[in-house]
Structure formats: C-alpha cells, structure tokens
Design a protein with these regions (language model features):
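Hydrophobic positions on the alpha1 helix immediately C-terminal to the Walker A/P-loop
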Residues: 48
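Conserved lysine of the Walker
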Residues: 45
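Walker A (P-loop) phosphate-binding loop of P-loop NTPases
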Residues: 42
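N-terminal pre-Walker A segment at the start of P-loop NTPase domains
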Residues: 1-24
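Cys/His-rich finger/ribbon microdomains and the adjacent scaffold used
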Residues: 56-57
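Glycine-rich, often acidic-flanked micro-motifs
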Residues: 16-18, 22-39, 51-52, 63-266
C-alpha cells in the first residue's frame, strides 16, 4: 500500500502484477525479454509467470521505473486447488518443507497434501519464497530486476464468454481496459463466492490503490508509449470460440509463448 502511494509521487508506476524474463544474460538487462502479467486473483498470474522456460522476477507486486522493473516481494502466494505437477510443475514442486499451506487438507502420517480436497474451501493456498522456484531472479546483483517490459499481458477471466482468447490492444484501448479492470471473481477467491461472478477492478488491483485510478492509467500510457510496449489481452476464462468451456491452461501457455516470440521476432 505504501509503495502504491510513494512510487506514484516519484513518477514510478506501482503495479499489481507478476513478471518474468527470458533466460538471457543476467549481466545486461538491455538484452532481457520481460513480460508483465496483470490480473486479479484466479486469472493465472502466478501460474503463467512461473514458466520453466523463463526466469521468474516476482509474483504479485512490481514497480516500473525509468530503468526497468523491480520486484517488491520475496515470495509467491499460489492457489493450490486441483494442483497437478503435469500442469504446474514449478508451483507443485515448491510445496515442500518451509512452504506454508493455507486451507489445504493433509492426510496420513507424512501430512500429504490433498490438493483436490475442497472440503474446507476452494481457496486453498501455498506461500513459498522465490528461491523455491528453480528459475527465479532471487539472488545475485540483479535479483528481482528486469529491463523495460517487452510486452504486457492483461489476464481476464471472462465468465460471460464475450472476449476472444487473445487480442492485441491499441495504447488507448489498453489504458481504458486497465482502468476498467473487467474480469470475474472466481470460486474460492473471496468469502461466499462459489461460482464465477463478473466484476470490475480498476488497474487490476482496486483494493490496493491509494490514488485515483486515472493517475496510474496516465503513468501506464506514458510508459507504454515511450517504450513502444505492446499490450495483449488474454482471456483465461470462458469463450464461445471454445465451445463454452473454460480455456485449457495448455492453450493459454501457447498464447503466452506466441506473445513472447512475436515481440522477439518483430
């Protein structure tokens, strides 16, 4: 909350976002291919930024300055419901000694987590340090740092099936969508939410904002214009293009891979 206040005064953009970068040189941030993921709980920020093929900068809060982006948190807070190693290998392997499980049912003498058990709540979570992710920027001179974003991804979980799976936004449309923050509250993300509910959360982080959303929107437009940063909208929810079912994670991962390669190949 303090960073949302202070960084804005310093003309730095504090964001509710995750970030990763390519496996390029640690010693030259100018060679980085950095992706920022914006989105509310349940839209896929943690899952998609924890990519075995890329380096995780941070999970939830970043600041975009005149020199690039930096992470302001030292760990991750991942949803665990129906967690499977085949779908989310890095997060699955991070659930080990030293991590903290929340609302997760454990069984047997070895306290084995039962990730499919939602008898307490669907909002099962795990907190773990960044160092538990093998490909994370958690140590060294450039720990938690990245260059200017090469691409930004707005993650929205559209429960109405109105949005396409992927689209490229103009700068003006990007700012408008950023200010609107259209998404859905997912089951288990808040007390009493048992099915997807359409909602709007300004800047994809309304609970954390201190200033009027337009301050953050103005800073975002300034930065994406200055650095020619493309902004993509990715729907991780439901789509009529997919037969009215939720878009599978494997499809979304391929979209993110396309976005990263699209920018690199331009």
């Amino acid at each position: 909350t303090w960073m949302m206040y202070q960084m804005t005064i310093e003309n730095k953009l504090c964001l509710h976002s995750s970030a990763n970068r390519n496996k390029g040189s640690y010693l030259d941030l100018s060679t980085d291919n950095v992706t920022l993921f914006f989105g509310m709980s349940g839209t896929g920020k943690t899952t998609l930024s924890s990519d075995p093929e890329r380096i995780l900068i941070g999970d939830d809060e970043h600041v975009w300055t005149d020199r690039g982006v930096f992470n302001i948190e030292g760990g991750c807070y991942a949803k665990c419901i129906d967690l499977k190693e085949c779908h989310e290998p890095d997060i699955f392997r991070a659930v080990r000694y030293g991590s903290v499980l929340e609302n997760v049912v454990v069984k047997g003498l070895e306290n084995t987590p039962e990730f499919s058990d939602d008898s307490i709540t669907k909002n099962t979570r795990c907190s773990y340090p960044l160092s538990y992710i093998p490909n994370s920027a958690c140590s060294g001179e450039f720990a938690g740092l990245g260059g200017h974003p090469n691409q930004i991804v707005f993650l929205t979980c559209d429960a109405q099936g109105l949005l396409p799976p992927i689209s490229l936004l103009s700068p003006n449309d990007a700012v408008d969508f950023f200010l609107a923050g259209y998404t859905s509250k997912m089951a288990g993300t808040e007390m009493g939410v048992t099915e997807p509910v359409t909602t709007f959360s300004a800047c994809f982080g309304e609970p954390f904002l201190i200033w009027h959303p337009e301050k953050y929107g103005s800073l975002l437009k300034e930065k994406i214009t200055r650095h020619n940063t493309p902004v993509w909208l990715v729907n991780t929810g439901w789509s009529k293009w997919n037969g009215g079912v939720r878009i599978p994670l494997r499809y979304t991962r391929q979209m993110i891979k396309f976005i990263n390669n699209y920018t690199s190949d331009k």
